[in-house]
Amino acid sequence: MMLEQRERFMEMVKERGLVRGDFTLASGAKSTYFFDLKMVTLSAEGAYLAGRLVFDLLRDRGIDAVGGLTLGADPIVAAVALVSHMEGKPIPAFIVRGEMKEHGTQKAIEGYISQRGSSVAIVEDVITKGGSTLKAIKAVEEAGCQVAKVVALLDRHQGGSDELRRRGYDFTAILHADAAGEISTE
């Protein structure tokens, strides 16, 4: 079942999330293709599949909460929380702000992180160099949490996943892209 869901998710990314053209990525790198996975994760089926695929990786790992840097992680963490509830194994969600809020509670993290020492998973829509992921990791570690797992929906294989592993994080990608933007499940 998970393989069928991964294949369907890959089809959706190819159909809705892959855009060809000239782009500057968040890392500053230039690219002839761009993955706009919000076009997938904000659809009903895509949200379900993303939530299901990530939840299946986190199930039975003792994860206390799942989160990531806004905006790419937002629909993913909500989908994981929903799927986990449907499975009777609720994993609450949190979102790491890109910039510190200067009014109200001035929180760097919104949502649920239970306490210092919590075991959390960080999710990302697309990982390139890893800057956004590392920013989220830094915020949750500064809040006293342990990062037990890092999951990206798609790895562009441009150094980010290698850097996370080099730093000792347990990283998994659902899909992979090569230098030409071709997507695979391996």
What are these regions (language model features)?
Residues 61, 76-91, 163-178:
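Short acidic, glycine/proline-enriched helix-loop-strand junctions
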Residues 2-12, 138-186:
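PRPP-dependent phosphoribosyltransferase catalytic core
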Residues 62-72, 149-151:
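Short glycine-rich phosphate-binding loop at a beta-alpha junction
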Residues 27, 111-117, 143, 163-164:
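Solvent-exposed alpha-helices and their adjacent loops that cap or buttress functional pockets
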Residues 77-121, 129-134:
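Short, glycine/charge-rich flexible loops or terminal/linker lids adjacent to PRPP-binding catalytic cores
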Residues 1-62:
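Active-site-facing substrate-recognition patch
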Residues 59-64, 114-117:
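Short helix-loop-beta connector
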